[in-house]
Amino acid sequence: MEDTGIQRGIWDGDAKAVQQCLTDIFTSVYTTCDIPENAIFGPCVLSHTSLYDSIAFIALKSTDKRTVPYIFRVDTSAANGSSEGLMWLRLVQSARDKEEQNLEAYIKNGQLFYRSLRRIAKDEELLVWYGKELTELLLLCPSRSHNKMNGSSPYTCLECSQRFQFEFPYVAHLRFRCPKRLHSADISPQDEQGGGVGTKDHGGGGGGGKDQQQQQQEAPLGPGPKFCKAGPLHHYPSPSPESSNPSAAAGGSSAKPSTDFHNLARELENSRGGSSCSPAQSLSSGSGSGGGGGHQEAELSPDGIATGGGKGKRKFPEEAAEGGGGAGLVGGRGRFVERPLPASKEDLVCTPQQYRASGSYFGLEENGRLFAPPSPETGEAKRSAFVEVKKAARAASLQEEGTADGAGVASEDQDAGGGGGSSTPAAASPVGAEKLLAPRPGGPLPSRLEGGSPARGSAFTSVPQLGSAGSTSGGGGTGAGAAGGAGGGQGAASDERKSAFSQPARSFSQLSPLVLGQKLGALEPCHPADGVGPTRLYPAAADPLAVKLQGAADLNGGCGSLPSGGGGLPKQSPFLYATAFWPKSSAAAAAAAAAAAAGPLQLQLPSALTLLPPSFTSLCLPAQNWCAKCNASFRMTSDLVYHMRSHHKKEYAMEPLVKRRREEKLKCPICNESFRERHHLSRHMTSHN
């Protein structure tokens, strides 16, 4: 890797992401079959937990010299279109220029897909780069103006004088990797209102589309240090665990910004709904909600550009007070107030499998059109998650303008209750302090989920954390923008499909043992004869009794052979215990194996109300008083008799053939005496001993 001066802010705390990135860098992907033109692969699995795990990973891998010791051969025709995504897409190398590029990355349904640009022959390496829309979104602008300005064929960085032979590594270096550019973005002052790249045009948020698009493309190539502010590329931790936008505090916060691709792509999705605004206009008029206050001009934060802001400081307090002090102040607010709602809200709502054929999707450049053709089943539950937020944000913006002061109140950042499921916190306001109490991780899902239907709309819904207490919180804590009812969603009704911009699920170590047992019960198929110890399945459980109770709960919940599947049992009952792991006598085990081989047994679950607790001292002794029907063991024979009368007296008679076969099997091998029940034979065998 040639860029050794990458800021440590990217690497700190991201060891796993870095390891994944290194694995991706040193692996190339070759296809084992021919790929036709316009073939679609994806979605690419991204958790968006770091810069390396976002849509920027393609640019971060781009280098002039490739060192690829590992070759990954993929049958690209197999398993295409699965909802889980294709893991090998992360391993595809970045193209260095347009000549060698054969795959194009684009966003559909908020997820990252690859599309073949031409016919790719067998045993050819797959090389990907961003499509036109993502190139504009990430400000990976073409280098034509650079060539005109310099007149030299190699690409040279004007800041660090590093030379590149290929175009794509050069623009990736400018956008993400140049250490001097990143450093100057940190230390540069917040003035330079007049200089730089079209600050007033961008700040207005509604100027000429062509001029803005031209300035947007030329911005990263400006020779001055002004455009260096466009590159806050360090992945700094947020000031608050509830904040998705680190630079949310108004009036002098020194928090460093981070590139929030989540809000960028959400805004891109939002802008598709309006047929009157071009991509450049929609991006430049408020798409910078992801990192207010000197965030990148790439993200076109109107306040950061109009004020030339460096670190969340507001040059004009009256504008900060009017807009709420957060990201997307003037342009974003103006756009949502003045622009009419789109006629069709059904944007970005097709599944990856639904439209696989070539030509069945719409490009982002097709002004204001849907990403996919509307399907007949596209209904209320499948629409975008950000449609309701516009009305709520519009009402809340009129409310907030009278109450916010110049010191700064956090802007509701139009994705409140939607995209990240989080609010933009304020550092110096009681209103912001109330917003900080909103539980971000499980967070308020969009109002589309209130009906309990599976949300298959926008990909920007938060993935609920397992066992999160805040997963069903109301929309009141999501910020002022969601106060109109866009917040309260159920965590249980969330989409199963992974989003490229979703928050990651919480790890199992944060769950209580019983909750963990319930979550893993359906995942681990268990059978009484497996002999799998509960301590192996649940190593995190602290006390041994909890392990036994847990194992029993999951045994009853996971065994497919039980008729009711454990549905009628409270899984946290203290009288449920894992009898499958208790030791049995050898004769009883042999008889059990013989009976199991005879045919399917009709098992019946005991009722949790009358099941008697066992004595745990019997764990060290052979269990003699055990029920052959439900595998429960008892210390006293009277307890077993009571159990048999209360539980299995009304059991339906089995088929005659199976019954006769079972009676033949339950025969004493010493005296040839037959028994109807297995525990009778077991008790009889002890008399021979």
Swiss-Prot record:
Coiled coil: none annotated. Belongs to the class V-like SAM-binding methyltransferase superfamily. Residues 241-258, 273-286, 423-433 have a biased composition (Low complexity). Residues 193-210, 322-333, 472-491 have a biased composition (Gly residues). It comes from Homo sapiens (Human). The gene is PRDM8. Residues 16-131 form the SET domain. GO terms for biological process: corpus callosum morphogenesis; corticospinal tract morphogenesis; methylation; oligodendrocyte development; regulation of DNA-templated transcription. This is PR domain zinc finger protein 8. Probable histone methyltransferase, preferentially acting on 'Lys-9' of histone H3. Involved in the control of steroidogenesis through transcriptional repression of steroidogenesis marker genes such as CYP17A1 and LHCGR. Forms with BHLHE22 a transcriptional repressor complex controlling genes involved in neural development and neuronal differentiation. In the retina, it is required for rod bipolar and type 2 OFF-cone bipolar cell survival. Transmembrane segments: none annotated. Residues 185-333, 397-506 are annotated as: Disordered. It is linked to Epilepsy, progressive myoclonic 10: A form of progressive myoclonic epilepsy, a clinically and genetically heterogeneous group of disorders defined by the combination of action and reflex myoclonus, other types of epileptic seizures, and progressive neurodegeneration and neurocognitive impairment. EPM10 is an autosomal recessive form characterized by progressive dysarthria, myoclonus, ataxia, cognitive decline, psychosis, dementia and spasticity, with onset in childhood. There is variability between patients. PROSITE patterns: SET, ZINC_FINGER_C2H2_1, ZINC_FINGER_C2H2_2. One of its GO terms (cellular component) is nuclear body. Expressed in brain, heart, skeletal muscle, testes, prostate.
